[in-house]
């Protein structure tokens, strides 16, 4: 299923991953990574806003602009200071690009707008937080992303991904 589309981009995405891994940049300093990603997306005909949302290293690439259904693929590409890509954002960001390239190839059969959004500075300030506060995601039906882990899973019980409500009973102590 879609094997030819997958194979057609494999080498370029692997090169992208290796380039980002070999050139780790910490939050809001992902100039090489964001430029490499944007260059690859544009090479394959994806319209890209760069920089995006008043963030120098953020971008948004759009496939099938103007469709009523809207989906976002999020891409992270920042590194950890002193540790490089120990969190694997070189790989997860590249996989998001891989998905966008394949979906762009299949765009005629997709009745939805698909945006790939580069979300810088995930490790420190949280670039997605600024985007949420600015309403970037308000008009999307869904947003997805991938993150590296030591096993395959559709979902994981992370505090940052789950919603919890706490109710405290008693009298103030101070």
Question: Model segments located where?
Answer:
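Acidic/His- and Gly-rich active-site-bordering loop/insert found
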Residues: 3-112
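Histidine/acidic-residue-rich, glycine-tolerant segments that coordinate divalent metal ions
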Residues: 57, 78-84, 90-91, 110-174
């Amino acid at each position: 299923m879609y094997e030819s589309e997958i194979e057609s981009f494999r080498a370029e995405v692997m090169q992208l991953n290796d380039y980002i891994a070999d050139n780790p940049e910490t939050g809001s300093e992902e100039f090489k990574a964001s430029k490499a990603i944007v260059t690859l997306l544009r090479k394959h005909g994806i319209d890209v806003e760069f920089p995006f949302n008043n963030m120098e290293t953020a971008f948004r690439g759009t496939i099938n602009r103007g469709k009523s259904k809207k989906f976002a693929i999020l891409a992270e590409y920042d590194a950890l200071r002193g540790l490089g890509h120990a969190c694997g954002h070189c790989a997860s960001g590249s996989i998001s690009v891989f998905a966008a390239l394949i979906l762009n190839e299949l765009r005629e059969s997709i009745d939805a707008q698909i945006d790939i959004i580069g979300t810088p500075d995930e490790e420190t300030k949280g670039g997605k937080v600024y985007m949420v506060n600015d309403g970037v995601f308000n008009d999307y039906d869904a947003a997805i992303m991938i993150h590296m882990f030591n096993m395959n899973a559709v979902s994981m019980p992370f505090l940052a991904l789950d919603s919890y409500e706490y109710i405290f009973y008693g009298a103030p102590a101070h």
